[in-house]
Amino acid sequence: MSANHMTPGEIVSELDKFIIGQNRAKRAVAVALRNRWRRQQVAEPLRHEIHPKNILMIGPTGVGKTEIARRLAKLANAPFIKIEATKFTEVGYVGRDVDTIIRDLTEYSIKQTRELEMRRVRSHAEDAAEDRILDALVPPPRGASGEPERGEDNSARQTFRKRLREGKIDDLEIEIEIAQPMPQMDVMTPPGMEEMAEQLRGMFAGLARDKKKSKKIKVREAFKLIVEEEAAKRVNEDDLRAAAITNVEQNGIVFLDEIDKIAARQETGGADVSRQGVQRDLLPLVEGTTVNTRYGMVRTDHILFIASGAFHLARPSDLIPELQGRFPIRVELDSLSAEDFVNILSETDASLIKQYTALLGTEDVKLEFTDDGIRRLAELAFSVNERTENIGARRLYTVMEKLLEELSFDASANSGEVITIDAAYVDLQLAETAGSQDLARYVL
């Protein structure tokens, strides 16, 4: 089910499968997504006046800001882009300008819409691919116009069709005409000239379009290539572009990470002009403007912007007032406790424990984590965070990697064994490293 049709409670329940705690942030993004659906039910002209309420997430690193955005993207099945605010420079300076955010979002939407359309016409494309392969195996008689006249009463053709569907002639080589793939042009351009590079790539790709070449390949490979070619023929490019642009305008989500890095403190100098310039350039995008892309004009009035930052050295109030006003919903994310680490390791759907168990299971090594082992692992990770840099849940990656380092290296030698990871095993592998502040700082 698409998140656009889910209630806020259902969206939060889905996010709970992957993210521990942070209920305020989950509720905020769930309501924002549900408001998308609500707006679509409102009649015009009022619908056009209802704008999304952008969200600012504030919290230390590793507490789930990016993960909430990543999971939301999968759940929403909408055009989504995550970008670092620090990658952009003020218009007029060397570097990328903020309009490329919308261009990249539109590119993603085009790709997403094309995949959807290709799936829709796939069954017809497969039928056409079958016929073209059978034409190569059993050439049909040609009519007065020179076109092949396919008749299903041909017993040889029917026999080959049956064998083709059963996969019995997959390794048979046939000679067939297929469209040449578009050349991959690598156009080197200075920063900020990405649009020109895209136009040049499109021009060179257009030169090779519709050119066909006779190739001798196996039936299995030919079928895949012809299905793609036939599906592309059945997709109307103009309709696809219009649908993709509408999808961006009505359902697009932009996640602006590290926005605190472009917030200038009053007492600092130097790069402040450029930072404030990026903020000023973001203003029209967030408020609503029209951006020119290679597929047409895109309005940003109803695109949802979610910004996030740790705000260690700066405060949200250090953003220019106009930009502060464009993010009316602010949610603070909590620092993670040792108990949260236990839940992250044991309760999430794709926990690190499940990942490592599956990875080593491919070499017939069975890992069994006990409750006291999980708790000890969480306590050590939390302790290292407290004594060194606090990187939140990301500390679990480094601790888990160190814990299973020897086991991963010698996995093939331990094939068929059951390894129990309890508190004693965790202490044996990690206690010395975690206990020494110097070692913990550089190893964990």
Curated annotation (Swiss-Prot):
Residues 130-158 are annotated as: Disordered. InterPro entries: AAA+_ATPase (IPR003593), ATP-dep_Clp_protease_ClpX (IPR050052), ATPase_AAA_core (IPR003959), Clp_ATPase_C (IPR019489), HslU (IPR004491), P-loop_NTPase (IPR027417). Keywords: ATP-binding, Chaperone, Cytoplasm, Nucleotide-binding. The keyword Membrane does not apply. The keyword Iron does not apply. GO terms for cellular component: HslUV protease complex. Its main location: cytoplasm. It holds the Pfam family AAA_2. It comes from the Bacteria. GO terms for biological process: protein unfolding; proteolysis involved in protein catabolic process. It is found in: Cytoplasm. One of its GO terms (molecular function) is ATP hydrolysis activity. ATP binds at residues 20, 62-67, 257, 322, 394. ATPase subunit of a proteasome-like degradation complex; this subunit has chaperone activity. The binding of ATP and its subsequent hydrolysis by HslU are essential for unfolding of protein substrates subsequently hydrolyzed by HslV. HslU recognizes the N-terminal part of its protein substrates and unfolds these before they are guided to HslV for hydrolysis. A double ring-shaped homohexamer of HslV is capped on each side by a ring-shaped HslU homohexamer. The assembly of the HslU/HslV complex is dependent on binding of ATP. Belongs to the ClpX chaperone family. HslU subfamily. This is ATP-dependent protease ATPase subunit HslU. The gene is hslU.
